[in-house]
Structures are given as C-alpha cells and as structure tokens.
Design a protein with these regions (language model features):
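Two-component system phosphorelay core
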Residues: 2-76, 80-138
Length: 138
C-alpha cells in the first residue's frame, strides 16, 4: 500500500465515499397556471423565457461575485433572484436565495459558500424543470 494510504492497518483510500448532491426542486404549477391565465399563452411563455434567461445570467453573476468576495453585490444579486424565481413558481430556488442573503447578513462566510453552491445546484435543476414542464426549446 502506498505511503499515506494506510492508517493503523486500515486502508483509508478504499473507504473514501463520494457524496452526490441531488436537490429536489419545487415548482409551483399554480403560479405558472395563473401567469398563463393572466397573460395568455404567448405572453406567459415570453415572461417565462425571459425569466429563465435572467435567472441563468444572475446565477452565474452570483458565483463570480462570491469568487471576488464582493458580499454587498452578491447580496443584491441573490435578492434579485428571489422575485424572479417567485414570479415563475420556483419556490425552492427562491427560498435558497433567501438563505444566501441571510447568511451574508450575519457574516457567516462558510454558510454563504454552502448556501450559494446549493443555490447553484437547485437553480440548474429548477431551470431545467421549468423548461421541461413548459415543453420549451432552447
């Protein structure tokens, strides 16, 4: 066994686990139905498409701000995600964006990192779920 792989007769490397993060997303289909009822099919699809594009851009922007350690602007960007996600029924994404802003407010940088990257995972899955639910093509 190579050096560093065994500890007290126990093969450490053989015991390494990979944690797979799989987040459940929650979509409020009633919000989407209400949007379609209010705006009609064409109007609602336009709103949903623009919201999805904006969410994708802002998620990327949030990650960039975190890497630059720009907490005030990260907070603003995360807050902006809440309203957009709520508008099209992405309840999980909106809640995690609230968690990011809360972690920033209490200066808990470990929590900011954890919740931000949870937001990235949920954001990606939420965007995919809305595309699939609406049967939209990119």
């Amino acid at each position: 066994v190579p050096w560093g792989h065994e500890y007290m007769g126990f093969n450490v490397v053989a015991q390494i686990l990979t944690v797979i993060h799989k987040e459940n997303v929650r979509l409020d289909s009633d919000k989407l139905s209400d949007l379609y009822a209010q705006l009609g099919e064409a109007g609602a699809e336009d709103v949903v498409c623009r919201a999805i594009e904006e969410l994708a851009v802002r998620l990327s922007h949030c990650e960039r701000l975190w890497r630059q350690n720009d907490m005030p602007n990260l907070r603003k960007s995360a807050r902006s995600l809440i309203a957009i996600a709520d508008q099209i029924g992405m309840t999980a994404m909106a809640q995690v964006a609230r968690d990011v802003t809360g972690a920033i407010d209490i200066d808990d940088f470990a929590a900011v990192a954890a919740t931000l990257f949870r937001l990235m995972r949920i954001g990606e899955r939420s965007l995919t779920a809305v595309w699939e639910q609406q049967d939209l093509s990119v």
